Amino acid sequence: MDSHTVSSFQVDCFLWHVRKQVADQDLGDAPFLDRLRRDQKSLKGRGSTLGLNIETATCVGKQIVERILKEESDEALKMTMASALASRYLTDMTVEEMSRDWFMLMPKQKVAGPLCVRMDQAIMDKNIILKANFSVIFDRLENLTLLRAFTEEGAIVGEISPLPSFPGHTNEDVKNAIGVLIGGLEWNDNTVRVSETLQRFAWRSSNETGGPPFTTTQKRKMAGTTRSEI
């Protein structure tokens, strides 16, 4: 098991515990409480997948955070916060690409958590790129405005957008929705790649093919799921 995966889970467990204490003192607003509930479900799922006890992971996460805070000077902390807390808005798409109307010959739609995934399953054997406009904080995707799938000819063949009835979404929500979209498009033998900007801030990584770091098994599973559920 990757040590980074374990330590990330441990820190996330401790930070969730801190946020829970904030909520218990009636200091959290509605979006804060909504994220707290959704993150709790996510942590339970991750804990089950990793085979880790959440209570133990929380204690270890506390030690990791305390060590970092002890080693970091106040001045370094101030500089980090000043640069990281400034939310940035990044654009893969032009205004025209975002606002352009499009239609589907074989429309398919799926609600993936707080996001809506739409695609045209009539599209086959195309090279497709996913572009998105979104905000970033702490060098991680914070809020997705709109994601669209484009063919080499510029036609729009898929889209992911937030549901107005579900305020707020996480980075994991976006990645899961992208997985559904990619699985559906690849089912029809399309080749899908993700823009470099989206790779960098959604996955904090990239690869030569332009695809997110899904394994072959994951892609096959997503394609099968998409066929039956979308």
Curated annotation (Swiss-Prot):
A motif (Nuclear localization signal) lies at residues 34-38. A motif (Nuclear export signal) lies at residues 137-146. Its main location: host cell. It is found in: Host nucleus; Host cytoplasm. Upon interferon induction, ISGylated via host HERC5; this results in the impairment of NS1 interaction with RNA targets due to its inability to form homodimers and to interact with host EIF2AK2/PKR. One of its GO terms (cellular component) is host cell nucleus. Keywords: Eukaryotic host gene expression shutoff by virus, Host cytoplasm, Host gene expression shutoff by virus, Host mRNA suppression by virus, Host nucleus, Host-virus interaction, Inhibition of host innate immune response by virus, Inhibition of host interferon signaling pathway by virus, Inhibition of host PKR by virus, Inhibition of host pre-mRNA processing by virus, Inhibition of host RIG-I by virus, Inhibition of host RLR pathway by virus, Interferon antiviral system evasion, RNA-binding, Ubl conjugation, Viral immunoevasion. Residues 223-230 are annotated as: PABPN1-binding. GO terms for molecular function: protein serine/threonine kinase inhibitor activity; RNA binding. Disulfide bonds: none annotated. Inhibits post-transcriptional processing of cellular pre-mRNA, by binding and inhibiting two cellular proteins that are required for the 3'-end processing of cellular pre-mRNAs: the 30 kDa cleavage and polyadenylation specificity factor/CPSF4 and the poly(A)-binding protein 2/PABPN1. In turn, unprocessed 3' end pre-mRNAs accumulate in the host nucleus and are no longer exported to the cytoplasm. Cellular protein synthesis is thereby shut off very early after virus infection. The dsRNA-binding region is required for suppression of RNA silencing. This is Non-structural protein 1. It comes from Influenza A virus (strain A/USA:Texas/UR06-0195/2007 H1N1).
